[in-house]
């Protein structure tokens, strides 16, 4: 009977050994899990108490020269007062302070050097963090010819309009002068006899030996028709005459 009990005792002993080994392994795994959990909690606690890196972005990344832009620097730390500072490369631009959230910086792109890189810095009394770099893309005007045309067009139109106006004024003035001359000629003339004023010069010579200069007098004769008169002794002659009265 003893021979029959020996294998049973050995199997029970081996089962106890395996069970102890499994218990030790389970205990070690449980300890490791608790340790890792505590480490994670400590890391989270450090992140909550420390600063997080801010985020810098803009509503537009492609701009033109001379355009106004805005950069937004945001932080997830909302429980403490934070100072936000903006940098262009290593050059300091501006600072704002508030309790977490986001702040906006307004800029004007005046030259190609102001395209970037921009960087935002957040800091409190204990630490500071920087954001990623941000760059703008500056595009040139599509065509300079259109700008040139818009500048030259007013000058070209002005150059065309002014000569046209001058020509119209000249024609109007010439027409007015011609009409006035015709009216004067019609008022001077009468009947079918063409009478036009001519310029005559009367030269009066001084007496010999006098030192006075010669004077030239100009006058315009006016011709008028008068009725013919009958002369005595010439009744038989039927010649027609036209008489004019000369007035100075």
From Swiss-Prot:
Residues 1-33 form the signal peptide. A motif (ITIM motif) lies at residues 216-221, 241-246. N-glycosylated. SMART domains: IG. The keyword Transmembrane helix applies. It is a single-pass type I membrane protein. Keywords: Cell membrane, Disulfide bond, Glycoprotein, Immunoglobulin domain, Membrane, Phosphoprotein, Signal, Transmembrane, Transmembrane helix. Immunoglobulin-like receptor which plays an inhibitory role in degranulation of mast cells. Negatively regulates IgE-mediated mast cell activation and suppresses the type I immediate hypersensitivity reaction. This is Allergin-1. The lineage of its organism: Eukaryota, Metazoa, Chordata, Craniata, Vertebrata.
């Amino acid at each position: 009977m003893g021979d029959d009990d020996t294998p049973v005792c050995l199997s029970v002993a081996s089962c106890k050994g395996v069970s102890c080994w499994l218990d030790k392994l389970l205990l070690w795994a449980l300890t490791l899990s608790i340790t890792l959990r505590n480490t994670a909690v400590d890391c989270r606690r450090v992140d909550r108490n420390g600063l997080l890196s801010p985020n810098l972005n803009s509503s537009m990344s492609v701009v033109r020269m001379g355009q106004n832009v805005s950069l937004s620097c945001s932080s997830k730390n909302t429980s403490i007062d934070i100072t936000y500072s903006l940098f262009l490369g290593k050059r300091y631009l501006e600072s704002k302070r508030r309790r977490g959230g986001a702040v906006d910086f307004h800029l004007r792109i005046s030259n190609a050097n102001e395209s970037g890189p921009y960087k935002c810095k957040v800091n409190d009394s204990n630490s500071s963090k920087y954001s990623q770099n941000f760059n703008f893309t500056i595009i040139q005007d599509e065509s300079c010819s259109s700008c040139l045309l818009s500048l030259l067009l007013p000058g070209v139109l002005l150059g065309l309009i002014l000569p046209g106006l001058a020509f119209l004024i000249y024609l109007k003035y010439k027409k007015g002068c011609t009409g006035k001359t015709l009216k004067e000629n019609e008022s001077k003339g009468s009947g079918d006899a063409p009478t036009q004023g001519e310029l005559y010069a009367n030269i009066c010579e001084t007496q010999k030996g006098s030192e006075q200069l010669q004077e030239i007098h100009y006058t315009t004769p006016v011709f008028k028709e008068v009725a013919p008169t009958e002369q005595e002794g010439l009744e038989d002659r039927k010649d027609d005459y036209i008489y004019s009265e000369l007035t100075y």
